[in-house]
Structure formats: C-alpha cells, structure tokens
C-alpha cells in the first residue's frame, strides 16, 4: 500500500535550511506538481484508518489544504482551514506555531463548542504545529476524535502522543543532507 507516496518520497530532492535537512515533496510543498493519483492514494488511506464520525475536518494552511479539501469532497464533511491571516471574527483563536525551522501565528475560526473534529495535515516533524492546533481546538470546545498526518519525521509524532493527543501517521521518513533514505509505512499508530 501507499506505493505512489513511498516512491515519490524517495525521489524528493533535499536541501539544507540552517541545520535542518528539508525535503521538497508535492504533499509537503506542492512542488514540483501534486499528482491526482498521489492525493487519491493518501485520501483513500485516511478513509481506511481514520475515525470520520465527525462534524468537521480541520487542517492548516497551506499544505494541509489539498489533503483536507480532497477528504472533504469525498466524505461531504465540512472543512475548516486554520489560516495564517487574522480575520478578527468573533471567537477567533490565535495559535502560536513552532515548526522545525520557524515560528509564526495562525488563526482558528469556524469551530463551535461540541464540534467533533478530525485534524489532518501533511507532515509532523517537531510536533509543534499539531500540539498547538490540538490545544486551540480544545480551547474552542471541540472534541478531537482523531488526527491523521501523512508524513512522520523525527520525534514530533511521539511528542504529540505524549501530550495526550490522538495521532495516526501514514509513513515515517528519515532524511540526510542528500536524500530521503528511508520510507517506512506505519501501521495504525494512534
């Protein structure tokens, strides 16, 4: 399973950003192009492994959008996108996001108390974004039924789970300064 995803990860170029070996991939960057068969494979796998007894799908701008959008289209579950822009709407929650290479603010709107949600995203590296999003969802009164991230890298997924949040991943990758050298399919980590 996930042969298209695995093959595409092995083909991903890598560059150094500070001390971080950053791989460039259609799921994580939208570059060079995002093929429909790749998104289809990812979304079909999410449907197989996720608890979709939810009111809303939640994702983060930008690279969670292709995954969350496709999942929403297939399941008819509404999509909430956590944005990088503040809108100032009533109930908006500011989220401090820390990734493997940057810090920023993102903004959650469209979640009501009692909403049952699934969080989907492209990659978890440090776990900073996922933990911040889960805390914001809890602050909004949402019930986090599940979380699925396509690519697991580093110790971030374990950090998320250790913080008490659900998280399933699809593949785990290891990257050095030249290439993605290991892609391992994950069987039902939650």
Curated annotation (Swiss-Prot):
Sorted UniProt keywords: Cytoplasm, Glycosyltransferase, Purine salvage, Transferase
Gene3D superfamilies, alphabetized: 3.40.50.2020
GO CC annotations on file: cytoplasm
Catalytic activity: IMP + diphosphate = hypoxanthine + 5-phospho-alpha-D-ribose 1-diphosphate; GMP + diphosphate = guanine + 5-phospho-alpha-D-ribose 1-diphosphate
Metabolic or biological pathway, per its Swiss-Prot or TrEMBL entry: Purine metabolism; IMP biosynthesis via salvage pathway; IMP from hypoxanthine: step 1/1
Protein EC: 2.4.2.8
Predominant subcellular localization, coarse grouping: cytoplasm
Pfam families xrefs: Pribosyltran
GO biological process: one example: IMP salvage
Domain of life: Archaea
Protein localization: Cytoplasm
Molecular functions per Gene Ontology: guanine phosphoribosyltransferase activity; hypoxanthine phosphoribosyltransferase activity
Record's keyword annotation contains Chloroplast: no
Assembly with partners or alone: Homodimer.
Protein function: Catalyzes a salvage reaction resulting in the formation of IMP that is energically less costly than de novo synthesis.
Similarity comment: family membership: Belongs to the purine/pyrimidine phosphoribosyltransferase family. Archaeal HPRT subfamily.
Protein name as it appears in the record: Hypoxanthine/guanine phosphoribosyltransferase
The encoding gene: hpt
């Amino acid at each position: 399973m996930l042969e298209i995803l695995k093959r595409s990860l092995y083909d991903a170029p890598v560059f150094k950003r500070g001390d971080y070996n950053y791989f460039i991939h259609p799921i994580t960057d939208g570059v060079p192009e995002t093929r429909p068969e790749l998104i289809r494979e990812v979304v079909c796998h999410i449907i197989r492994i996720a608890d979709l007894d939810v009111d809303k799908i939640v994702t983060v701008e930008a690279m969670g959008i292709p995954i969350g959008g496709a999942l929403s289209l297939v399941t008819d579950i509404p999509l909430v996108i956590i944005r990088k822009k503040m809108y100032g709407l009533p109930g908006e929650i500011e989220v401090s996001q820390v990734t493997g290479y940057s810090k920023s603010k993102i903004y959650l709107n469209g979640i009501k108390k009692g909403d049952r949600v699934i969080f989907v995203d492209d990659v978890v590296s440090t776990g900073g974004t996922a933990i911040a999003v889960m805390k914001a969802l809890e602050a909004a009164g949402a019930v986090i039924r599940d979380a699925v991230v396509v690519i697991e890298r580093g110790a971030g997924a374990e950090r998320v789970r250790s913080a008490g949040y659900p998280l399933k991943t699809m593949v785990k990758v290891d990257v050095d300064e030249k290439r993605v050298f290991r892609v391992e399919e994950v069987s039902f980590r939650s």
